[in-house]
């Protein structure tokens, strides 16, 4: 099973420590199954979706912040159309304040 931890950063020069920490936390046995993908908010929705689709994850996690939340919401709408069997997980400060509400709004999301 392939896991994709995804960050959408504010700038190309930024990186997201959360996805690196999560991958490190799974342990050496599982690390080969965890891939990281970093994009920026300046990339098009189509480009990001293509980058995700090429990796063919079975499970994808998004690190959600104020600067990327609008774009991630768009991705959540489109992603099930191209990867219908992929589980979607959300984390970060933009999704932890109202998990039940977000799960109602985005039924395609597996969990927070």
Where are these regions (language model features)?
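Nucleotide-activated donor-dependent transferases that construct or modify glycoconjugates
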Residues: 1-11, 59
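N-terminal subdomain of nucleotide-sugar transferases
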Residues: 1-3, 26-33
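Short N-terminal binding/cap micro-motifs at the start of the first secondary-structure element
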Residues: 12-18
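Glycine-rich beta-alpha loop elements in corrinoid/cobalamin-binding modules
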Residues: 18, 25, 33-112
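Short acidic-aromatic active-site loops that bind/stabilize oxyanions
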Residues: 11-12, 65
């Amino acid at each position: 099973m392939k896991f994709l931890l995804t960050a959408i950063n504010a700038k190309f020069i930024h990186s997201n420590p959360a996805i690196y920490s999560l991958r490190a936390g799974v342990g050496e046995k599982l690390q080969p199954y965890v891939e990281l993908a970093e994009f920026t908010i300046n990339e098009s929705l189509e480009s990001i979706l293509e980058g995700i689709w090429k990796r063919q994850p079975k499970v994808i996690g998004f690190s959600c912040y104020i600067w990327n939340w609008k774009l991630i919401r768009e991705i959540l709408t489109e992603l099930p159309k191209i990867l219908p069997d992929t589980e979607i997980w959300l984390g970060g400060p933009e999704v932890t304040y109202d998990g039940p509400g977000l799960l109602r709004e985005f039924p395609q999301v597996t969990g927070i």
